Amino acid sequence: MVPELQKSTVRIQQPERVMGVIRAIKEQGCSKLQVISDFDMTLSRFGCNGRRCPTSHNILDNSHVISEDGKKKLKDLLHHYYPIEIDPNRTLEEKRPLMVEWWTRAHELLSQQKIQKGDIAQIVRESDVMLRDGFNELFDQLHKYSVPMFIFSAGVGDVLEEIIRQANVFYPNVNVVSNYMDFDDSGVLKCFKSPLIHTYNKNNSVLQGTAYFQQLSTRTSIILLGDSMGDLTMADGVPSVENILKIGFLNDKVEEQRGRYLDAYDIVLESDETLDVVNGILRYILMET
């Protein structure tokens, strides 16, 4: 059915159930399908040539528009909060307020840097960001079959949209909900628009998605792509779900997180920098039989 599922990076706890879901989504047809995806480290690569690839926040943090002092403070925040974000021994309840604190402090620091709206394209061009191998096929196929793609990101929307734009895949079927910058009349960043989206509130509490999902109420088959426990709630705004396939990229601390990911995601991709498996499943689902 889907030869890509034989890749060595693939782990599936319940293969029969997963194949059943994939078959059911195919039977429902592409008019019933929508894709809901995280962006950073899901559509973009986690690592390349042994180095970490940047997230949409990192792209700003590391860019020429941030002062040395600003860079140091942002790095300090990362070193303090990132271990908390991925700590398997803390509950989501413990993590949530700390993530709000991190994002708020980072956005306040960025807002002091006088970032110009016109600089963002250049900042993205100069960065090391890479989309996962196979991104062209993913975006092209979804566009060709008019399958809506909802990108739900705790990153920076302005940066993320620019990455997709520069990759020439920002098609009309792609919708983004993320943290967007608010510029003053002269195009200088003054703050970020609310609501704040962090790793662990990607759910109904962020209301921008709900109107979107209402319009797509007939699309009851969902493929969800994520890389964190916080991404599992991204489809919570969908009014009725008949079939959902959750695919998780396990990028970091693979050994210690494997058990939790296998329990939470239908398919887990370990240290896999490609979209091969996603594309293989879509090829099977979208193939006219």
UniProtKB/Swiss-Prot annotation:
It catalyses: N(7)-methyl-GMP + H2O = N(7)-methylguanosine + phosphate; CMP + H2O = cytidine + phosphate; a ribonucleoside 5'-phosphate + H2O = a ribonucleoside + phosphate. InterPro entries: HAD-like_sf, HAD_sf, Pyrimidine_nucleotidase_eu. Keywords: Cytoplasm, Hydrolase, Magnesium, Metal-binding, Nucleotide metabolism, Nucleotide-binding. The active site is at D38, D40. SUPFAM superfamilies: HAD-like. CDD domains: HAD_5NT. It is found in: Cytoplasm. Signal peptide: none annotated. CMP binds at E85. GO terms for biological process: nucleotide metabolic process. GO terms for cellular component: cytoplasm. Its EC number is 3.1.3.91, 3.1.3.5. Mg(2+) binds at D38, D40, D227. GO terms for molecular function: hydrolase activity; magnesium ion binding; nucleotide binding. It is an enzyme of class 3 (hydrolase). N(7)-methyl-GMP binds at E85. Substrate binds at S153, A154, K202. Specifically hydrolyzes 7-methylguanosine monophosphate (m(7)GMP) to 7-methylguanosine and inorganic phosphate. The specific activity for m(7)GMP may protect cells against undesired salvage of m(7)GMP and its incorporation into nucleic acids. Also has weak activity for CMP. UMP and purine nucleotides are poor substrates. Belongs to the pyrimidine 5'-nucleotidase family. Monomer. NCBIfam families: HAD-SF-IE. This is 7-methylguanosine phosphate-specific 5'-nucleotidase. It comes from Gallus gallus. The lineage of its organism: Eukaryota, Metazoa, Chordata, Craniata, Vertebrata.
